[in-house]
Amino acid sequence: MKFSHALLLASSLAFFACGGDDDDSPTGANSRYDCSVTGGVKVVYPTISEQFKIGQEITVVFGTDIEDNGYKIVFKKNASDMGVDLLEEAYDAVMDGKTCNEVKVKLDAKRGVEPTLTGIIRVAPYNKQNKGNNSELFIVKE
């Protein structure tokens, strides 16, 4: 009887130790985020009050149902900033209105990313900019 209790305890501890929920990246975005959207773009990551550093690579997660030839990922230092494109070329997204697209981008000072308390990622169809959408506000430090 004691052996079975010890075995049960050990297996429970192993289950929790292998969880992976402590990871900061949005791995398995379809299961962690609701990317469902109708008639536009929905940016689900980064979320509000996230903190990043200049030079850090982050994963932008978004859903869309707007058919286009690609998507722009733009960093804005505040709501009124025009922003800087973080990609060399347009991103080819899955546009079914339910899939979470994950795009790795670098917050690179060489591209114009600056420290800010009001950073925004804007994801927009390349040819239909008015259908784009912004992330929540986040922080970028030196």
Q: For each predicted feature, which ranges?
A:
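Sec-dependent signal peptide recognition
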Residues: K2-L9
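Residue-level signal for mature regions of secreted extracellular proteins and peptides
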Residues: S11-S12, G28
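C-terminal motif of bacterial Sec signal peptides marking the signal peptidase cleavage site
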Residues: F15-A17
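Extended, solvent-exposed regions of the mature portions of secreted/cell-surface glycoproteins
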Residues: D21-E142
